[in-house]
Amino acid sequence: MEIKDQGAQMEPLLPTRNDEEAVVDRGGTRSILKTHFEKEDLEGHRTLFIGVHVPLGGRKSHRRHRHRGHKHRKRDRERDSGLEDGGESPSFDTPSQRVQFILGTEDDDEEHIPHDLFTELDEICWREGEDAEWRETARWLKFEEDVEDGGERWSKPYVATLSLHSLFELRSCILNGTVLLDMHANTLEEIADMVLDQQVSSGQLNEDVRHRVHEALMKQHHHQSQKKLTNRIPIVRSFADIGKKQSEPNSMDKNGQVVSPQSAPACAENKNDVSRENSTVDFSKGLGGQQKGHTSPCGMKQRLDKGPPHQQEREVDLHFMKKIPPGAEASNILVGELEFLDRTVVAFVRLSPAVLLQGLAEVPIPSRFLFILLGPLGKGQQYHEIGRSIATLMTDEVFHDVAYKAKDRNDLVSGIDEFLDQVTVLPPGEWDPSIRIEPPKNVPSQEKRKTPSLPNGTAAHGGPEQHGGHSGPELQRTGRIFGGLILDIKRKAPFFWSDFRDAFSLQCLASFLFLYCACMSPVITFGGLLGEATEGRISAIESLFGASMTGIAYSLFGGQPLTILGSTGPVLVFEKILFKFCKEYGLSYLSLRASIGLWTATLCIILVATDASSLVCYITRFTEEAFASLICIIFIYEALEKLFELSESYPINMHNDLELLTQYSCNCMEPHSPSNDTLKEWRESNISASDIIWGNLTVSECRSLHGEYVGRACGHGHPYVPDVLFWSVILFFSTVTMSATLKQFKTSRYFPTKVRSIVSDFAVFLTILCMVLIDYAIGIPSPKLQVPSVFKPTRDDRGWFVTPLGPNPWWTIIAAIIPALLCTILIFMDQQITAVIINRKEHKLKKGCGYHLDLLMVAVMLGVCSIMGLPWFVAATVLSITHVNSLKLESECSAPGEQPKFLGIREQRVTGLMIFILMGSSVFMTSILKFIPMPVLYGVFLYMGASSLKGIQLFDRIKLFWMPAKHQPDFIYLRHVPLRKVHLFTVIQMSCLGLLWIIKVSRAAIVFPMMVLALVFVRKLMDFLFTKRELSWLDDLMPESKKKKLEDAEKEEEQSMLAMEDEGTVQLPLEGHYRDDPSVINISDEMSKTAMWGNLLVTADNSKEKESRFPSKSSPS
């Protein structure tokens, strides 16, 4: 048989065509020179299994730029067609380059715009005494799902592993089979006629079996979700199914049955029933019904109706349809064995436009691709593997796009070759192909396969993706007074109304209820501590009022409403020092505090006017993590400390003698030696110790009259209290455990997705509610939340407004600027570091941030609170992180086995606004709030602190100290930074964290903001210990000097010029086919040299020779 050259065979046989006709690409049987193979080469071949590159989680928007390469493409085709026999394609024309060229082109119509694909594999099934039918055996959205043998259920999604032999056979099928691109057809029967006519005309199918093949293709399709109607009522039904049915659209008839589209008449003329934009499927036109349907969450509208009673009916799996993205199309793979065939029938069809082929696919979406493989008996498993191969290829992100944009079979073969060039081979002796690989949590991006890059095998020395930098336009200096503030207002104003509309979600309600309980306790506790430190001049009611007023104003007009304002430790330390100073020198505390607050507000406004917030760009991950870790640890420490302090109020007897229980008592007695203060109090209250019946007093009365407790059941100044401390410990740890368990309930396997999502969103609120009910039912008098019940200042000698001067000397107003400078640093650092953490790029915020506007609102409200004698409030790190975590958005339509993709944060103002409105109204809800046990709130604090530690890289690196290298996680920085450098970076960060902790818990806590600022300089000094590349992986790069930037820009320009010169260099092939870089290969050329490919070509030759002895009986159509 005459051997044809590769270039001629790869060229389409119909170079010109009418737009209304399908592109027919016949191809050839040989693409390389004839090769002889040794017997042992063929017999000793072993199957290699390939780990397929899994597709990207959600398909990104495809590039639509206009490529000016059509003329060049035409010229390349003419050049290829003019190659002499035996000529090779140029070495630089690799499949990867051709695929990148294909994906870079833009078509004039929308028919070649890639859509998401649902792929279904059907195999023809023959049973004795029954009519043959097509049975669904596997399906793909992102990962493979198989129908379990005999189980009548779907397998868990898994990553497909393919044999190299089946991929080669698939490539041969595309090369030698029938390829029909952009076929215009409306029914499966039309498609079958066109395919078989082409097969007969090309001599690939005998005319005498055409009719029988046509009948086989038109057999009924049976899907896994299809169930025949019976009179039997299922008795056993799982709760998950019940929940699933309740959560699904109820647009079906009362039985939940719809007509099997296979048995319904097809509408051949109306091809506009399929909408290309949102995949709207109109069943009423195909079935003649009038009943309207329901629009699914993914945008697919079904109009379903019942057919005649004698027709077989099937259920549409609406739960599975929710997982199909909007605009998705179907790819149908039909494979099987037919006893009357003596050779394989192969066809690849792309429809234009996509058509709803009723009954062909499991779900009612339009079909775009069909792959048909029918052959003689005895090769069923081989056909099945080829079908799995093409189905897996259709889920590959790159080949999927190539299939949509391909102009001929050459493009499809290039797509297969590019796929082969990217796969990973698993050794057959070290891997069991029956093992199903679990889908990965994070699917790698395939964008580098779509864009031109360095040659094969050449490592690209690129840097890491910068996720955490703060070099956005929000932090650019404007050089104008209030320039940054004006830009912040312009940036946030367009989103103001959407900040309220976007809050209509159950997730926001859950976040609001949770954070209200979480914010109430620290505000009241802070007010109580402040009341003790200031002798009641600022206490709980002032704290509640100040937090509510400041929070409402900030939530309405702040630049980043996701930030939650709260009280901080350094502020409390400052208040204590200031009160002690005023008491020693006889100054009015509230008046001097008002002067300091007004100066602080003024200085903060000056910082806003001069764009000082742009200095935030020097706060890198190193500083952020140290600060955030410290606040989280403080939350955990204080929660445990508060629980431990309960033992002082509710002591227990650790050494009981059970035999003396009848003698245990604790009585109130008159003090033996009352203090002078006690005697003075008795005289002022006209109380005589001899007139008091001390034995009849209650515990609180005895304490108020300064009596003494005497008896075996008395502790140090208190009577022993049974059960309360232990019950508080149980409530504390039960709250932590239940909150964490319910929060993770979203990833469990029980109940429908909607139920799991709601439980996870309301986890903390449900926990608090359950603990309150249990505590109320048990009846043990645990300590409860104490909320002021009257809205008035704590002390009667003060009002709601304070004059800055008051009784103090005039010079105190001027002197107040000195402590105001320290307060300004405190407010600026606390506010901006928290804002930086909230605005990190990992959170995918879309509405921008407003550092200048945030600082302005804090400054204004600080001045207002100073005049009204209320506490100062600034951004609370842990509460803000918790707020952001409670509003995370994930994709609703996710393929089976695919992890929901993080989409961003639900950015809105309502949750913060409602938290502080309700906080201000808490005075009127005392009768409800008094039932909340304090140990439950302490448990919430511990949970918040521990959950906020997740995602902090510092703690991941700390765990590496105790891990052997082979057991360490595959962190990206461990690939590029030596382990000793990673440990050195961690030790420095831990040392800084320890120093911050020492200062925070000591009397020097007022200088804590100064130490946080010092971390920026410590990070700058680390440039001498680490290279720039190492710091880019371990931390964010700090802004550099202008001179250094210019030098780097010049170097980059020189490198780009050299790269352009290299691209323009013409490389001439040398004698002996010498290759200057052995790592650069052409997968198509190398494949043609393999024994496996040669074996397939020998088989194809035999088929051709057999065909020549039995010529076709029909003429070409």
UniProtKB/Swiss-Prot annotation:
PTM comment: N-glycosylated.
Gene Ontology terms describing biological process: bicarbonate transport; brain morphogenesis; locomotory exploration behavior; multicellular organism growth; post-embryonic development; proton transmembrane transport; pyramidal neuron development; regulation of cellular pH
Signal peptide as annotated in the record: none
Cellular component terms (Gene Ontology): apical dendrite; apical plasma membrane; axon terminus; basal dendrite; basolateral plasma membrane; CA3 pyramidal cell dendrite; dendrite; GABA-ergic synapse
Transmembrane feature ranges: 509-529, 538-558, 562-582, 596-616, 626-646, 720-740, 762-782, 809-829, 855-875, 912-932, 935-955, 998-1018
Record topological domains on the Cytoplasmic side: 1-508, 559-561, 617-625, 741-761, 830-854, 933-934, 1019-1117
Organism superkingdom: Eukaryota
A single GO molecular function term of this UniProt record: sodium,bicarbonate:chloride antiporter activity
Gene3D superfamilies xref list: Helical hairpin bin, Mannitol-specific EII, Chain A
Region: Disordered, residue numbers: 1-23, 58-97, 282-309, 431-476
Keywords: Antiport, Cell membrane, Cell projection, Glycoprotein, Ion transport, Membrane, Phosphoprotein, Sodium, Sodium transport, Symport, Synapse, Transmembrane, Transmembrane helix, Transport
Biased composition (Basic residues): 59-76
Localization, UniProt: Basolateral cell membrane; Apical cell membrane; Cell projection, Dendrite; Cell projection, Axon
Sequence ranges on the Extracellular membrane side: 530-537, 583-595, 647-719, 783-808, 876-911, 956-997
Topology versus the membrane: Multi-pass membrane protein
Function in brief: Sodium/bicarbonate cotransporter which plays an important role in regulating intracellular pH. Has been shown to act as a sodium/bicarbonate cotransporter in exchange for intracellular chloride. Has also been shown to act as a sodium/biocarbonate cotransporter which does not couple net influx of bicarbonate to net efflux of chloride, with the observed chloride efflux being due to chloride self-exchange. Controls neuronal pH and may contribute to the secretion of cerebrospinal fluid.
Domain notes: The N-terminal cytoplasmic domain is likely to have a high level of intrinsic disorder.
Family: Belongs to the anion exchanger (TC 2.A.31) family.
Protein name: Sodium-driven chloride bicarbonate exchanger
Source taxonomy: Eukaryota, Metazoa, Chordata, Craniata, Vertebrata
GN (gene name): Slc4a10
